[in-house]
């Protein structure tokens, strides 16, 4: 499965406008992951945005347009979700999700290497 290159460009452009971020792109999760300061922040998977966010905000995030739980092998991953294209069409919604992920990235633990 490929990924939406226009969405990847949109994320790349947005992140480039934020100072003091170390950004690395990696092919992961059958898409393109944006690592911020050494930690997974967001991913483009197919046409969807995959978000990593503070699990305590799940109820708020789940109310947003385009929200889909991230389920792998029958398990719901708390603090991760997919957002369909309709949920990030407007810039205000796109920025909400990217900023949500960036905020969590500040306190998220890096995975073991």
Task: Show which residues each predicted segment covers.
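Charge-dense, helix-prone N-terminal extensions
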Residues: 1-113
């Amino acid at each position: 499965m490929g990924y939406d290159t226009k969405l990847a460009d949109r994320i790349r452009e947005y992140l480039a406008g934020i100072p003091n971020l170390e950004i690395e792109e990696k092919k992961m999760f059958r898409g393109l992951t944006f690592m911020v300061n050494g930690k997974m922040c967001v991913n483009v998977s197919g046409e969807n945005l995959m978000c990593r966010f503070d699990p305590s905000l799940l109820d708020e995030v789940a109310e947003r347009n385009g929200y889909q739980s991230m389920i792998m092998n029958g398990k719901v991953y708390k603090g991760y979700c997919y957002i369909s294209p309709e949920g990030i069409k407007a810039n205000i919604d796109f920025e909400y999700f990217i900023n949500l992920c960036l905020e969590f990235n500040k306190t998220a633990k890096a995975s073991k290497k």
